[in-house]
């Protein structure tokens, strides 16, 4: 897959805006056990029997994958289940391209444990030129708190970077993913170090297409660096009004409009071009409004979009702070 990847998942950095600031540190809920999840995994899962797929797999994979992405884009449990089952059926008939989309659609469909196993198998057979798979596997491991495995996967990714014009951007992607990992662990120094390396590498990429997105990638990474140390705003200090903020989502630009009333965020609307966002464009704004903080959990399988919404909201609030 010869393009620089956008990781299926990035951490929502835990920088509170301080609006309705927390008086005590919240205890992070325990991560689910990967060992237990894999032990309980049944392939195919029991819910396959209850899931009806209308699509005819007699049609070629190049058409089937479009239907799968449409189903994932519905942002519903039933849509996800149909997408996963359809992907499975194509894999069973050995019509699934080079196979890189098999674990990816499992993860996007919310089957994280299954995706973890599938990514491990795919990388084991295809260790080279699949940086996107390594980064997505890192995301799977982080979901289960397997941080040592995530770091080891990053090292493996660095050893198997493409040797062509995609090498630099893929290397930057790995550094950015490491920054997300360390940010989740609360290691600001290591997070910053990796983000800085990513931001320095993106502009140097000589990739044959997609260069127009590199400046946006740099801007987004710098936003993550800013989130590491952002100071808290005192409750009620935001000026009333509407403010716009921009970021880069999974498929293109994303803009939010933040409404502030009586010093509090009362509404966040999202304008975007995302096709598969798993309702993150509705769920993340609600979480920010409810908590009056950017310290919100990402939507599983749509963490790129989730992070973009947080980043754009931060940009909008900065404008409010300068008013």
Segments from the language model and where they lie:
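Bacterial N-terminal signal peptides
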Residues: 7-15
